[in-house]
Structure formats: structure tokens, C-alpha cells
Amino acid sequence: MSFSNSKDKSVVAVYKLVKAPIYSHCFSQDKSILAVTCETDCLVYRVSNNTPPVLFATLKDHDKTITAVDISIHGRIVTCSQDRNAYVWEPLSDGTYKPTLVLLRINRAATSVTWAPNGYKFAVGSSARIIAVCYYEHENNWWVSKHIKKPIKSTINCLSWHANGVLLAAGGTDGFMRVFSGFIKGLDSKESVAGSPWGQKFPFGCLIREWYQGSYIHDVEWRSQMERIAYVAHDGTLNVVDYQSPVQSVNAPEGLPYRSLVWINDHEIVCGGYSCHPVLFSEASEGWKFAKNLDKSDNNKSSALTASGNTDELSGNNDESSTFGISALRKFKELDLKGKVSTDVQESAHENAIVELRPFAESNGQITQVSSCGLDGKIVIYTI
């Protein structure tokens, strides 16, 4: 484990926690607890200011890769896995967690999980073409699920609850972005959706809206106060839509798909993915557009090759479209000629793809810091 600070001012902290990909992470409400996935385990860390996270619990009941983790407002941890199971972990006074198996009733891997805002139910996406909405049944003392099936035709990659705890946005590999009703009788109240612009009646499992994107949907996030949804797709686009307007799309400046997004405020969104650094987009009068890169590696400053004596072929254009090709060519030529790569390049904090972004700090209704996890086993905190 290591704790370090980057030269880039947008990077607050870098935690190298494990030597395996981190597919999902989550902080507790007070940011004192950090849960990360690591193969078949969920590692729970205690976090304090300016010190590395300290591991204090390992949640071990899954026997296949854990795909997602989330923490409720009450401190309960939920995990889901490729073993087709989900567990709710109740924190105990001695610092341990008590697991409770959730009856998902699916025959394929569970892929995503998210708590509803009230912390009394959660939704699990799966490769079984099913969304399982799970809640606690006091009579039988266990967590049970109700299924949303139609018209889902493929794996569910991502889920997001509206602030009212009823509307559930879902995206997956069938190329559709959909909004369903996750209303649970006896748990949710009709007053919570009274006056909603999305409709008048919300029976469980009802399809409210759908939009066809034509490529995998990797992540989705509500902006509830504006009744808007943002999602990122494998075609390298960020898309924003509401209940009446057509989809507004903006392309990633580097052409690489994003895996996750976070609303910063009503008019700004930060995305992260295969470019290994966050990218900020903003809304202007003409629509959404690229605003700036955060913690982007500075490939343009790397030294030219001198061993080959042929620097002309690397000088070329320095525009954005040619940067990747030039830097890749330089890297492999240096490996071939010198056995190493020049180290005067400022690298980004993440060395591999960013898989998930989460809000970390907020001030006056605006997100000021976000956290990320990646395939390099790092947790990074950025200032926007």
C-alpha cells in the first residue's frame, strides 16, 4: 500500500491499495469508511485525513469476482458478484460485519448494485436480462427481490436511482437507456412521485421511457432536481436527456470510451474511462462541450530519440489527434534501442483505465472532489 501526491494540482491523493483491478469502490456518508472490490473479497478500510487507509475488515463470502459494492446512508454494505449472489453486510459494534444472503433468483452474474437514497432497498443489475429490486422483509427476516424483466434484452451494466427512490435508470449491452419504476408497495409512498413530469402512475416494473443509443451503456447518473439523466456509452459519447427533450451528445476528445460519470453541478459533468484521466464537460448555450482535462499525462514534453538519429519522423504534428500515435511510436522505439522509456513525462495518477467515479466532497450543492478506482488497483481523489 502506498500514499502519494501527484505533481498535478487536481490530484489530492493516490492510494495504491491492491495488486489487482478495483472494479468498484464506495465511501461511507462521513467518508470514514472505504470499501473496495478485490477479486473475490471486499476490503473495508478506515480512512482519516492525510494518512493512508487502514484495512480493518475483509468480507469473504463470495466465491467469484465481486463486480460492485455500495454503502447505504445507514452504513450497510451491499456487494454483488459473478457467483450470482448479493450480500448485505451489517456493521457490528466490534468493527466486524454480519453477512445476510439476498435471494436474487438469477442464473447469470450480478453486474451492478446501488442503494436507493433512503437506504431501505437496492437494485442489482445482471447478465440474466433482469434487474432485481431488493428490500428487507421483516416477517421472514431476510432480503427478498422483485424482478424487472421486460423489455430488457441483454446484460444490465449500470443503474441509478432518482432522488425520489422510485424511478430507476438502467443501461446495458442492448444499446438502450431505460427508466423503470422501482415502486415497492408498503415501502414507497405515492407522495414521493406526486407531480412528477415522468408520468402519473408508477406500478412496479413499468417502463417509463427508453432511448436507443446503439452501443453499450457503461454508466448512468440522475440529476434529480433538473429531471435529467446523463449516460456514457462505448461509442465514446457523453449523452444528456430529460423527459421531453431529445438526447444531447458530445464526443470524447480523445475518442476513447468513458466508463463512469459524476454530475458536478447542474451544468458540469466529469467523466473517466480508457484515457486514464478525468475529463470535464460543461453546458453552454449551444449545448454540451469539452471543458478541460484533469491530470492528463504530458506526452508532448517527452524527449526526442537521439540514439537513432532520426528525430524528424517523430516531430510531425503536435495536434491532439496525432499525440497518441507519436507517443506510442516513441515509447516502443525507446524500449527497442535503450531498453527503457524516457522518464521526463508527467504521467497521470492512474496507469490504467478508470472504472468508476464517485462524488467525494461537496460544497453549496456542488461537487468539489471526486474519487476514482481503476484497473491499476489505485484509488485517486481529484479536485475539480
Curated annotation (Swiss-Prot):
Could you give a single Gene Ontology term from the biological process aspect?
Answer: actin nucleation
* InterPro entries xrefs: ARPC1, WD40/YVTN_repeat-like_dom_sf, WD40_repeat_dom_sf, WD40_rpt
Gene3D superfamilies, per database record: YVTN repeat-like/Quinoprotein amine dehydrogenase
Where is the protein localized?
Cytoplasm, Cytoskeleton, Actin patch
Q: Give UniProt keywords alphabetically.
A: Actin-binding, Cytoplasm, Cytoskeleton, Repeat, WD repeat
Q: Where are the WD repeats?
A: 61-99, 105-146, 151-190, 212-251, 349-383
Chief place of localization: cytoplasm
Q: Where are the transmembrane segments?
A: none
Q: Which GO terms describe its molecular function?
A: actin filament binding; ubiquitin binding
The record describes the protein's role as: Functions as a component of the Arp2/3 complex which is involved in regulation of actin polymerization and together with an activating nucleation-promoting factor (NPF) mediates the formation of branched actin networks.
Q: Which family is it part of?
A: Belongs to the WD repeat ARPC1 family.
Q: Subunit comment for this entry?
A: Component of the Arp2/3 complex composed of ARP2, ARP3, ARC40/p41-ARC, ARC35/p34-ARC, ARC18/p21-ARC, ARC19/p20-ARC and ARC16/p16-ARC.
Name listed for the protein in its UniProt record: Actin-related protein 2/3 complex subunit 1
